[in-house]
Amino acid sequence: AYNNYISDNDSKMASYDYKEDTIPVNKITILSNATNCGMKDPVIWANLTELVVNARERAKIHTPYIICNDVMYRSLEEMAVSDADIILMTNSAPNNDNPVGAAELESSMPDILATGIDLWEFSGEKAYHGKSIVIDDNISIIGSFNMDIRSTYLDTELMLVIDSEEINAQMSSYMEKYEKQSVNILSDGTKENPYNVTEAEYTSKRKARKTLIQKLFSWARCFF
């Protein structure tokens, strides 16, 4: 079937130069959790933690949700005390279109801040769903992994680790656009707003769902 397609579309294929739309890289590595059903070893989480902790100068982490257990909080502590400048950006609770993610961020904020991680909350027009990391000037990581218990222990997930200065520069530029729509949450819970962002506010519907989950369903946070 493939050969027939190529033969039938020879003129289209011949006129396309993949090199014009691609970038040479030094190396690409695929990170994956196991594919079995049920609980899994946190392979991706362990690898991402190691990569971030070993950053020489900087690391930027973007994730839609932060839902951690004690092991994951300890990993954030390791990141926070590394020599590199590390930031973690996620949706603010009112801006999060996942009610479990919103409820958990509010409830666990003291625990997140206690790790010492430099936390930023995104308040753009729509909820942010980027799952990406840039490290130093050459490593870019992107894929399906959320920084939550489900991605860490239940779902398979995939992340690409790309060694390329050009890809890193592109990713950093894209990520910075979102960071400029976020506010910095300080260790005491107060906020700094260097980009004069208009912070998202709860709609009545989102606030009601968030409150219901906090009161009745917080025990199920690892399944969402």
Predicted segments with their positions:
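Charged, low-complexity intrinsically disordered terminal segments
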Residues: 1-224
